[in-house]
């Protein structure tokens, strides 16, 4: 019998991970992203929910009641090595206590903080387009996170 073998390359392909969705990054005027990122989490959003809460954080007086607003995104990882499954976006009314984007590898949750003025923009994206969430970290401490649509043709 004749045995046919698939042709395999004799050398392995270089282990370079290409950055996905780089066209959605802003210009790098300060040269913060000249090196390859240490981490990229890219998630395709498949579902979302909106939560409007009401809480009092303790029995101590005079702690006020707050009303947090957040959007929970669920999805599937798209980039090589990505494990993100959920994005939790909180909205701050005063934009004074925005927190840096953070990824928890244990819970596979990315946490983002936006000013309240961005809520309508986020909801418009989720209602009308395919949405991706991206999170990048660099050795110099730079962090970038965004929500973006895929490329859409103008009508």
How does the language model describe each region?
Residues 13-84, 89:
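OB-fold ssDNA-binding interfaces and closely related basic DNA-contact patches used
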Residues 81-105:
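Short beta-strand/loop turn elements enriched in aromatics
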């Amino acid at each position: 019998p004749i045995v046919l073998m698939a042709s395999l390359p004799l050398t392995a392909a270089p282990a370079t991970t290409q950055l996905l969705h780089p066209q959605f990054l802003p210009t790098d005027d300060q040269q913060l992203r000249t090196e390859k990122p240490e981490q990229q989490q890219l998630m395709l959003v498949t579902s979302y929910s909106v939560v409007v809460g009401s809480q009092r954080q303790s029995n101590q007086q005079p702690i006020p009641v707050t009303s947090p607003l957040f959007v929970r995104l669920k999805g599937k990882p798209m980039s090589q090595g990505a494990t993100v499954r959920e994005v939790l976006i909180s909205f701050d009314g005063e934009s004074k206590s925005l927190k840096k984007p953070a990824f928890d590898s244990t819970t596979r949750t990315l946490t983002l903080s936006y000013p309240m003025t961005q809520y309508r923009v986020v909801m418009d994206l989720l209602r009308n387009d395919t949405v991706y969430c991206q999170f990048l970290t660099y050795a110099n401490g730079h962090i970038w996170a965004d929500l973006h649509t895929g490329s859409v043709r103008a009508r």
